[in-house]
Amino acid sequence: MSFELNIVDMYSDILNIYGDIGNLKCIKKRCEWRGIKVNQKSYSLNHDMSFDYEDIDLILIGGGSDRTQSIVSNDLLKQRNDLENYVENDGVILTVCGSYQMFGHEYYDVNGDNVSCLEIFDIKTVSQENRLIGNILIENNLGWPQKKLWDLKIMVEGHFIIIKP
């Protein structure tokens, strides 16, 4: 039996402040080692959404500065209903670094400005001088009814991760 993983990489051209595109490369390599085919589509500003959310296994979004996250957040608002339905129907979103903030109810940047949010995750974020950084090891065995998934182990440095609300 062969497996396929459909990934949508969102805004990696501008949300890649700490080399977050490496997360996608790592996932793809791990899939290759396991004989899992990866189908990748990319989406960014001023691009047509040329994919169906029902066909997506994983959405990946990297991190950026407050300024770029504000720009992306405004663009993401166009996809709010689709993204909320995706999450509510057990879709998986890997938000790296500060990109999780855009999915919350409130996000105040370092200047205290309220950035428009998708209001999908029940979180409020206020930027502060001191940040939490360090290594995290996550083991996750997602038991989707339609697929059998492997243990996914990800080493992350300097990033917050939220996979599901």
Residue map of PLM features:
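Generic structural hydrophobic/aromatic packing signal, biased to beta-strands
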Residues: 27, 40, 59-61, 103, ...
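Cysteine-nucleophile active-site neighborhood
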Residues: 66-142
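Aromatic side chains
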Residues: 18, 86, 100, 160-161
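Fold-independent oxyanion-binding glycine-rich loops
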Residues: 10-12, 43-45, 62-64, 96-99, ...
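Conserved beta-strand scaffold positions in the cores of enzyme catalytic domains, especially
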Residues: 40-42, 120, 149
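Amide-donor transfer/coupling interface in amidating biosynthetic enzymes
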Residues: 2-9, 126-165
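N-terminal beta1-alpha1 cap of cysteine-dependent amidohydrolase-like domains
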Residues: 1-81, 85
